[in-house]
Amino acid sequence: MDYRELTARERQILGIIIQSYVVSAAPVGSKYIARHYNLGLSDATIRNVMAELEELGFISQPHTSAGRVPTDKGYRYYVDLIMTVKTLDEQEKQRFEQHITPLERKGTSADVLLSAVKVLGTISRQLSVVLSPTLSNALFEKLDMVLLSSTRMMVIISIQSLFVKTIVMELHMQVSRQMLDEVVDVLNERLSGLTLSEIRRSINQRLADCSCDNELKNLIVRSAGTLFDEMPVFERLYISGTEYLVEQPEFQQPEKVRDLITMLEDKFSVATLVEQHHANNPDVTITIGKEHGKRQAEDLTVLSAPYYVGDMVGTVGILGPKRMDYEHAVRILHYMAGSLSSTLSIQN
């Protein structure tokens, strides 16, 4: 976003307005600033600076108040050019580690992600989201098949000792346990160590000379796009802290609560909001208000960051009102992303 370069005084006043509004949820006036901040400026001078900030679109005046509140543009300027993010303090680090570190050796990846999203929600006091990694670059480890009935079987795919994907398939043929075992052995022998995307592209050629049951083999080849594709969003998504979001003053109006709950029930929509970072950029990405391009999300800020497990990339995020303690949210999100990367890499 392009800005007119603000003066030091304008930046200071804008920062104070945002920080005060975050704490109080009440519009901020010039008299409040003059009384509570030792700026060496008169009420009139502060009022003139605020008038200029309003003219530039960084703050606005609610209809029922003499004070001002930040606009999306004001928040964007603040997070891009004003705020400074400190490292996590030791007490917050301990709160993270006491929940996550014990899972390094005894917990599954799902245990780690579920614990992580709960801890993040508790510490941030916002709605928190964790998405398990996308799997195209993940290494296939092994596969098993279990007959559920004469017409259905379950395929269980293990990925890098961390993630398990299960799919139930319909059978239109008679299949014995021996036939399953033969196909499973061939698949594991020829596909183990390949990425899922490599398998999708080349499974037909890799099994072309297979002497195992052709009908079952052909079913697996035809279904490769599903079997070795990404897990569906509802299996990848972990959410915690919805209660913190709906308690915020911004969402007390019934229609806003209804819109918010409707959006949160759409897991694909939530995943789309938080997966806006670039996989090769470890920094926290912040998207504010109308930048989302979704009417239901115009009152929200979304922060997201990638975490890494080998070549796999997952996402951790925070959703909250635009009136958010951005410095705190950024530092805990950055720490959580790093913690997940190290914890899951140890498991791997």
Curated annotation (Swiss-Prot):
<keyword id="KW-0678">Repressor</keyword>
<keyword id="KW-0346">Stress response</keyword>
<dbReference type="InterPro" id="IPR002571">
    <property type="entry name" value="HrcA"/>
</dbReference>
<dbReference type="InterPro" id="IPR036388">
    <property type="entry name" value="WH-like_DNA-bd_sf"/>
</dbReference>
<dbReference type="Pfam" id="PF03444">
    <property type="entry name" value="HrcA_DNA-bdg"/>
</dbReference>
<keyword id="KW-0805">Transcription regulation</keyword>
<dbReference type="GO" id="GO:0003677">
    <property type="term" value="F:DNA binding"/>
</dbReference>
<dbReference type="Pfam" id="PF01628">
    <property type="entry name" value="HrcA"/>
</dbReference>
<protein>
    <recommendedName>
        <fullName>Heat-inducible transcription repressor HrcA</fullName>
    </recommendedName>
</protein>
<dbReference type="InterPro" id="IPR023120">
    <property type="entry name" value="WHTH_transcript_rep_HrcA_IDD"/>
</dbReference>
<dbReference type="GO" id="GO:0045892">
    <property type="term" value="P:negative regulation of DNA-templated transcription"/>
</dbReference>
<dbReference type="InterPro" id="IPR036390">
    <property type="entry name" value="WH_DNA-bd_sf"/>
</dbReference>
<comment type="function">
    <text>Negative regulator of class I heat shock genes (grpE-dnaK-dnaJ and groELS operons). Prevents heat-shock induction of these operons.</text>
</comment>
<comment type="similarity">
    <text>Belongs to the HrcA family.</text>
</comment>
<dbReference type="InterPro" id="IPR021153">
    <property type="entry name" value="HrcA_C"/>
</dbReference>
<dbReference type="InterPro" id="IPR005104">
    <property type="entry name" value="WHTH_HrcA_DNA-bd"/>
</dbReference>
<dbReference type="InterPro" id="IPR029016">
    <property type="entry name" value="GAF-like_dom_sf"/>
</dbReference>
<keyword id="KW-0804">Transcription</keyword>
